[in-house]
Each structure stands twice: as structure tokens, then as C-alpha cells.
């Protein structure tokens, strides 16, 4: 049984399940019944056919599907293979596309293969027609707001030969494609123009010929969330850049692990950066930019900032090397004025002037909600310099600055500055330098507990006992982050 069938069922639903099982004992009769079967009974019958792997019935049901969307991915989990089922569904889709005009009952416009999407559709077993249909309103179906290549996904009947969208999350790696994806790509290739492959979430780990062929088939303006982990040569990153420029509805972008070899010339770096950053001109909806371990970023951050078309809500630049001029451009750029989340985790801020960081925080203070300064090497004097700017961040809810050499005196000063921020609910702070043993890098837990108690008492005295303060430090044995005192300061 599927996870939906395995739960304790009310009597009417149990009767419906038994009726579906009875109907499926004679597959020919079940297929014939699809012509007159009420649309409310399609979801429970499909689930039963899916669970029992009745491929012939599934193929026929796709051709008579009375809803604009078939959320097949919601029935799948990662622990099983659904090769036969997916093949049956795609064969049904193929048969439907071959017919002109389309089958009378079929309203299918989207085959959604995303996991954990539209789960509620399958949980409705016998609601009113309006209730069932309301679960798949056109707004819920559209992979993006503005579509250039793909027709609107409204609930109207398809005109003859209107394309059907196959919506899937893709992860393009090295190696051979799994059978299901390979079969899907084959069908999309055979039905070019009638099957549109759309992808909301795309991860790219390799740019093989096979993967570039897939990218050529994807409606790239359907991509909203992109992760590019490119431990590649710069020439490969240049090859990917034009694909990025076609993702006009991109909201989130993570670019990580961009390295240069000792043989890379400065001119080659400049050409690559110029080509990649120019693609940002075509991303007017970008809201979240994450740059992790990108070596070619140093001294060139302004090239990206100049090409951003709209203000970012999230900016994360982690494990990179930035110069003073990068921070100067960042703090002066208009696109930081609406930031909600800012992370510099793993940046070496000791080479950055306090004034640049202070000015940046001042610019972001009206909207900033989350600030991460973990492992930045910030020392007391830098932290003291930015405290006034921090105290102006009226929307701040979380502040994290683990693994920085901060003294207890500065921690107490910080607490006094931020205690008036009414929305600040969680502070993850660095173990004070005084809590370390003099002869080693180990934490003296007894000493740390005393300091934690001092902060707790200060919060109570200042009227903020509900603000959570948690200390985090690296484990001396494995290096993993350890949180001191699982009971936070309350």
C-alpha cells in the first residue's frame, strides 16, 4: 500500500478503496469505465492503480485525466524505483499527444514529477467537484509568473496540439542517467513542441555532452532555483554562462567552488568573469544570491553588483577572499538597501576596515533580519566599531558570530546595544577568549558556564529574559560546531 493507503481510514474511504480494487481486477472493464467515471473518482482510482502497478490502466487514465495537472511526483519517494509506472504514464501522454483532436475528457496540461508537491490533491477522495478542482487552481500550477516559451497553464480545455508541460526538479551530475530520466528525455526529444520540459529547481554538477543536451531541451525560463557546483575549468564555466542568461525567472542562485589553476592567465579570468556577470542583466527577478568559495570574485564584486537588475533580499558571500574595494562597492551599491539576510561566514574580515562594514550595516539596517558573521576573524576593536550600526537594525531577528576572538567585555557591550531590538530573538555567540585554557585551544567549560550565567542575568535585568543566547565553538576532537548548554538563556 502507498503511504496514503497505509493510514487508518474512515469507513467510507475504505469502501471506496475496496471499490477501486474491485474495478481493477478486470483492467479492460476499468479502462472502458473511464469514459463515464465521475471526475471525483479519478484520484482514488489512480492511487489504487499506482499502488498495484496496473500499467495499462495508468496509461489509459492519463489520456482521460479530467484535471489540468497530474501531480505524479507526490506519489513517489526516493527509496523505490518507478520506472514501469513512469514509462506507462509517459506512454499514455505520448498516445494522447498523437491524437488530434485530443480525447474528449482529457484536460491535462501539466505532468508534475516534483516530489512532495500537491500532496493534498491525493488526500481528497470524495469531496465536491469544486473542492477537488480548487486544489489545482491555475495559480498553483504555474511554474513561474511570466513565461515566454510555454503556454499559459489555465484550466481551460487544451486547443488542438497544445503543448503539455512536464515539470521536474533536475540534478545533472557525472555518469549515466537513471532509466526514468533517460526515458523522459527520449520522449521529450521525440515530441518536441508538444512536450515542454520545465524545471523549477536545477542543480548542475557537471557539463558533459549528455547534460548540455538536457539543458538544450529544458525551458530555461522555468528555472527559479539554480545551484551550480562547478569544480570545473574556467572554460567549462564559460560554456555554462549562456544557459544562465536564459533563466529569466530565476529567484535563487548558488554558485560554488569556482577555482583557477596556476596556468590560468589574468586575461582568461577577466573574460570569464565578464561573460558570467553579464548574464545577470537577464535576471530581473533574482532575489537570493549565494557565492561560496568563488576564487575569481576577489576584487571584482562590483562587476556583479553593476549587473543586478533589482534589489536582493538575500546575499551570502562565504569562504571567499574579498578586498577592501569589494566591500566599498558593496556598501555603496543600491542593491543592498532592501537586504533581509546577509552572510559573510568564512570571510577574512580582518583585512577589511570597520568603516566599510559599519556603513554596509547602516545601509541594510531598515530591512536586515538575519546576519551571519561566523568565522570572520573579527576582533574586539572591529566589533566595537559596528555595535552602533547593529543597534539600528530594527528588523533583526537572528545574529550569529561564532568562532571569532571576542572578549567577554565586548559580549556584554553587544548585549546592551542589541537588547532594545524588539524583534531580535536569537543570538549565537562566540566562546569568549577568556573561556579558553591558557595552554591549549580547549574550552574550559566551567569558565564558559560562568560567563553564560552572567549574560543570562544581564538579559533578565534588562527585561529580555526570552531572548535566546547560545554559545557555539568548534569541538577540539572533530572540529564540528558544538553548542554549549542546550538549555538556552531564557
Language-model region placement:
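C-terminal capping region of solenoid repeat domains
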Residues: 1, 5-8, 95, 126-131, ...
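N-terminal adaptor-interaction module of cullin-RING ubiquitin ligase components
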Residues: 1-231
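Short, solvent-exposed loop/turn at the beta-strand->alpha-helix junction
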Residues: 25-29, 39, 54, 118-120, ...
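Extended amphipathic alpha-helical scaffold segments
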Residues: 25-62, 356-359, 369-377, 381-403
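Helix-rich alpha-solenoid scaffolding regions
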Residues: 55-98, 250, 260-291, 295-298, ...
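Conserved hydrophobic beta-strand positions in leucine-rich repeat
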Residues: 70, 106, 111-114, 122, ...
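A structural signal for leucine-rich repeat
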Residues: 213-219, 238-247, 264-283, 301-311, ...
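Amphipathic alpha-helical interface segments within eukaryotic helical scaffold
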Residues: 222-231, 249-252, 260, 272, ...
Amino acid at each position: 500500500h502507498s503511504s496514503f493507503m497505509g493510514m487508518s481510514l474512515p469507513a467510507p474511504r475504505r469502501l471506496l478503496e475496496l471499490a477501486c480494487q474491485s474495478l481493477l481486477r478486470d483492467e479492460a472493464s476499468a479502462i472502458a469505465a473511464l469514459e463515464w467515471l465521475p471526475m471525483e473518482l479519478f484520484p482514488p482510482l489512480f492511487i489504487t492503480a499506482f499502488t498495484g502497478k496496473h500499467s495499462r490502466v495508468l496509461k489509459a487514465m492519463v489520456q482521460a485525466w479530467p484535471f489540468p495537472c497530474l501531480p505524479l511526483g507526490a506519489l513517489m519517494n526516493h527509496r523505490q524505483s518507478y520506472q514501469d509506472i513512469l514509462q506507462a504514464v509517459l506512454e499514455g501522454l505520448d498516445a494522447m499527444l498523437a491524437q488530434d483532436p485530443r480525447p474528449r475528457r482529457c484536460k491535462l496540461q501539466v505532468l508534475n514529477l516534483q516530489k512532495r508537491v500537491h500532496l493534498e490533491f491525493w488526500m481528497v477522495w470524495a469531496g465536491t467537484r469544486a473542492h477537488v478542482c480548487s486544489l489545482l487552481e491555475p495559480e498553483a500550477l504555474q511554474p513561474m509568473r511570466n513565461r515566454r516559451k510555454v503556454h499559459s497553464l489555465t484550466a481551460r480545455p487544451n486547443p488542438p496540439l497544445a503543448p503539455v508541460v512536464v515539470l521536474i526538479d533536475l540534478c545533472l551530475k557525472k555518469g549515466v542517467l537513471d532509466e526514468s530520466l533517460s526515458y523522459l528525455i527520449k520522449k521529450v526529444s521525440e515530441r518536441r513542441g508538444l512536450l515542454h520540459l520545465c524545471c523549477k529547481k536545477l542543480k548542475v554538477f557537471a557539463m558533459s555532452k549528455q547534460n548540455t543536451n538536457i539543458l538544450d531541451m529544458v525551458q530555461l525560463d522555468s528555472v527559479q532555483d539554480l545551484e551550480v557546483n562547478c569544480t570545473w575549468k574556467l572554460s567549462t564555466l564559460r560554456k555554462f554562462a549562456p544557459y544562465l542568461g536564459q533563466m529569466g525567472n530565476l529567484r535563487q542562485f548558488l554558485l560554488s567552488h569556482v577555482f583557477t589553476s596556476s596556468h590560468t592567465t589574468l586575461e582568461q579570468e577577466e573574460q570569464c568573469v565578464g561573460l558570467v556577470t553579464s548574464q545577470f542583466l537577464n535576471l530581473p527577478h533574482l532575489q537570493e544570491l549565494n557565492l561560496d568559495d568563488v576564487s575569481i570574485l576577489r576584487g571584482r564584486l562590483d562587476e556583479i553588483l553593476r549587473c543586478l537588475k533589482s534589489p536582493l533580499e538575500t546575499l551570502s558571500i562565504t569562504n571567499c577572499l574579498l578586498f577592501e574595494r569589494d566591500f566599498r562597492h558593496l556598501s555603496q551599491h543600491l542593491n543592498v538597501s532592501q537586504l533581509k539576510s546577509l552572510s559573510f561566514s568564512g570571510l577574512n574580515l580582518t583585512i577589511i576596515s570597520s568603516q566599510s562594514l559599519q556603513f554596509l550595516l547602516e545601509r541594510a539596517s531598515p530591512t536586515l533580519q538575519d546576519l551571519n558573521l561566523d568565522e570572520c576573524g573579527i576582533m574586539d576593536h572591529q566589533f566595537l566599531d559596528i555595535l552602533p550600526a547593529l543597534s539600528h537594525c530594527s528588523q533583526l531577528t537572528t545574529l550569529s558570530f561564532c568562532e571569532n576572538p571576542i572578549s567577554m567585555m565586548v559580549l556584554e557591550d553587544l548585549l546592551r546595544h542589541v537588547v532594545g531590538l524588539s524583534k531580535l530573538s536569537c543570538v549565537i555567540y562566540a566562546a569568549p577568549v577568556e573561556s579558553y585554557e591558557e595552554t591549549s585551544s580547549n574550552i574550559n567549560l566551567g569558565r564558559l558556564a560562568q560567563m553564560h550565567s552572567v549574560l543570562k542575568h544581564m538579559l533578565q535585568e534588562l527585561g529580555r529574559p526570552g531572548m535566546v543566547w547560545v554559545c557555539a565553538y568548534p569541538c577540539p576532537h572533530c572540529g564540528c560546531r558544538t553548542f554549549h548548554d542546550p538549555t538556552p538563556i531564557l
